[in-house]
């Protein structure tokens, strides 16, 4: 089952602060919903261990996240793949950052492919779950970057 995501978020921090947070495994571990561990595997690749609940079914997932096509501090592509008790999935998203007068605008777009038991809950429910998880990520990221000291230029 295919899922498409996209949107934009505004963060009231300088672009460098947001870029640093998006490239900090400790911050990402706190922000990725259900993330239990994020283990460096070399370069810009990390092993992920997640516990997620989809509809009324919960399970654990193990996978990989990698960063590519980085153009600091403006753009990055993220690729994710994994499998677990509920099925398997993979996807990628591109994030672009643009400095605004008093904030940073983040635009994102991506797509994912989900299979296995989790795909059986239906596309409408999965889209709702995906939107909820994305909202959780951005809420946590906003909390992390606004609590952080300003980035040094």
Question: Which role does the model predict for each range below?
Answer:
Residues 39-81, 136:
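Glycine-rich portal/gate segments that line the openings of hydrophobic small-molecule binding cavities
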Residues 2-8, 45-47, 60-62, 75, ...:
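Intrinsic-disorder/low-complexity, polar/charged segments enriched in Ser/Thr/Lys/Arg/Asp/Glu/Gln
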Residues 82-128:
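Beta-strand/loop substructures that line and gate deep hydrophobic ligand-binding cavities in soluble
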Residues 7-9, 35-36, 62-69, 91-99:
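Hydrophobic/aromatic beta-strand elements that line small-molecule binding cavities or substrate pockets
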Residues 1-47, 51-53, 147-153:
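Hydrophobic ligand-binding cavity/cleft-lining segments
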